[in-house]
Amino acid sequence: MSIGRLTKQKNFSYLINEFSTFSKNNEDFLLYILGDGEEKNKLIKLIKEKDMEKKVFLIGRVNNVFNYIKNSEIFILSSLWEDPGFVLAEAGLGNLFVISSDCPNGPKEILDYGKNGLLFKNNQKNDLANSINKYISLTENEKFSMKSKLKKNISKYSIFKHNQIFKRIFS
């Protein structure tokens, strides 16, 4: 899954192209993209061109993303740049495995490649698809360990501590 405004910054066209490549050998995965924006029609067209209408779903704007997070396995951030990457923290706190572009501001501060998530080179052909395949090759213990380390790293940031407290109160 991925979350964000459907804008050039979020680079969802790259995500859809890479997911299409990945899906050729992995038919059981689906991609849900939450958000709305000016690139919606362009992305719908790309999904049709790639014949991915049954695998990639543009959900639109959602008030409670945690309902989607709790039913997902992986969070992918494909942004060209990010300020400051709160969505990565939300995904990590939601117990998702995080795969992110190595874009400026956010991901590299939160993720340590291979220790608490995976980073890929943005717009590099097959790099995201290879990262998803890397995730699949991990054992359940490795996935659990990496997600736990990500939560621990996120907890260092005070704003995320407050987010956890609010989440407990309102859950």
Language-model-derived ranges and their functions:
Residues M1-T21, L31, E38-I44, F86:
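A conserved mid-protein helix/loop that constitutes part of the nucleotide-sugar donor-binding site
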Residues E90, C103-G114, L118-L119:
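Short acidic/histidine- and often glycine-rich active-site loop of Leloir-type glycosyltransferases
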Residues D112-G114, L118-K125, K134-E140:
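Conserved acidic donor-binding segment of nucleotide-sugar-dependent glycosyltransferases
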Residues V65-F66, P84-G85, P104-I110:
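Short glycine/proline-enriched, acidic/aromatic patches that form the donor-sugar handling elements
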Residues F66, E73, L93-N95:
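A short alpha->beta transition loop at the rim of the catalytic pocket in nucleotide-sugar-dependent
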Residues L119, K143-S171:
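A charged, aromatic-enriched C-terminal amphipathic alpha-helix characteristic of glycosyltransferases
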Residues F97-S101:
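Short hydrophobic beta-strand element within catalytic cores of glycosyltransferases
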